């Protein structure tokens, strides 16, 4: 025990004799004085004399930058943008325009690159003789007479989209309504707004006179409700368009159900040689 106490006392003496070092404190940046703010606008000399104000100005200049907003990239001066504006201009005017007129509308001179793009565009027709540009619609139809001639040339009575006709015929709706009143075309309108959507050629050879008596009989035929229409058609063996035809059961003659034949066992007995299968009842006393 004495040796342990001696060791403990010697350890305490060594710890007590060791020098004490102070913990280094972090240096606080000196706050700029009011004179530094006043001298910050004097030039480079004042900035060099007061380093605190220089660092403060540098930090503020960094925070003023906004990195989320890209720099001005010149939107509208790109070739494809100018080409789009030129095509829309020719589409609205719907007449041949020279390069000078297009440049006046774009407020920029036509460079050789832009002229080459205009000439090779599939929606623009370039007349080399007159050096004019014309918008090329999806269908080269610009009047009612042209529409009737195009529909008559078709082998089938296929309709046309009015949206496609409006591409090169701005006032197509007004003229189509006049043709409808004359009985030249048939229009399909939207259910909500009644705006024409499709147009067909009206075949006047299909027009026939029907007496009012037959018209009255036709309108007096009762029509079942929409929910019962499919079942009513199915009773007569008809195929409703809203129902799968394979699920419709046609009404036929009352046929008796076929009876299934009993299955006959076609097995062959091979153990007839055994005596146990013989009848010995006659041998009883």
UniProtKB/Swiss-Prot annotation:
Q: Which InterPro entries match?
A: TFA2_E-tether (IPR054600), TFA2_Winged_2 (IPR040501), TFIIE-bsu (IPR016656), TFIIE_bsu_DNA-bd (IPR003166)
In this chain, composition skew of type Polar residues spans 1-10, 33-44
Keywords on record: DNA-binding, Nucleus, Transcription, Transcription regulation
- Region described as Disordered: 1-56, 240-272
The chain's coiled-coil residues are none
- Which superkingdom? Eukaryota
Which GO BP terms apply? transcription initiation at RNA polymerase II promoter
Name one matching Pfam family: TFA2_E-tether
Q: Say where the protein is mainly found.
A: nucleus
Q: Which family does it belong to?
A: Belongs to the TFIIE beta subunit family.
Q: What is this protein called?
A: Transcription initiation factor IIE subunit beta
Its source organism is Schizosaccharomyces pombe (strain 972 / ATCC 24843)
């Amino acid at each position: 025990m004495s040796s342990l106490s001696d060791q403990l006392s010697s350890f305490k003496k060594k710890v007590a004799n060791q020098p004490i070092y102070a913990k280094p404190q972090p240096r606080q940046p000196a706050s700029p004085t009011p004179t530094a703010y006043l001298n910050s606008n004097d030039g480079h000399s004042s900035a060099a004399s007061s380093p605190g104000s220089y660092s403060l100005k540098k930090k503020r200049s960094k925070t003023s930058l906004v990195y989320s907003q890209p720099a001005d990239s010149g939107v509208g001066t790109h070739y494809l943008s100018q080409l789009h504006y030129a095509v829309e201009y020719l589409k609205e005017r719907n007449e041949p325009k020279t390069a000078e007129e297009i440049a006046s509308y774009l407020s920029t001179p036509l460079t050789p690159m832009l002229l080459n793009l205009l000439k090779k565009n599939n929606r623009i027709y370039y007349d080399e003789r007159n050096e004019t540009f014309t918008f090329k619609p999806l269908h080269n139809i610009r009047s009612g007479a042209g529409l009737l001639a195009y529909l008559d040339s078709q082998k089938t009575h296929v309709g046309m989209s009015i949206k496609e006709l409006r591409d090169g015929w701005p006032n197509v709706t007004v003229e189509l309504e006049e043709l409808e009143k004359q009985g030249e075309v048939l229009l399909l309108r939207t259910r909500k707004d009644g705006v024409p959507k499709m147009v067909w050629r009206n075949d006047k050879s299909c027009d026939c006179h029907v007496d009012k008596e037959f018209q009255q009989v036709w309108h007096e035929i009762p029509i079942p409700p929409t929910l019962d229409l499919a079942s009513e058609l199915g009773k007569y063996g008809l195929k409703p368009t809203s129902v799968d035809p394979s699920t419709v059961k046609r009404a036929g003659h009352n046929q008796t159900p076929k009876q299934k034949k009993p299955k006959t066992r076609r097995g062959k007995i091979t153990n007839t040689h055994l005596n146990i299968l013989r009848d010995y009842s006659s041998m009883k006393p």
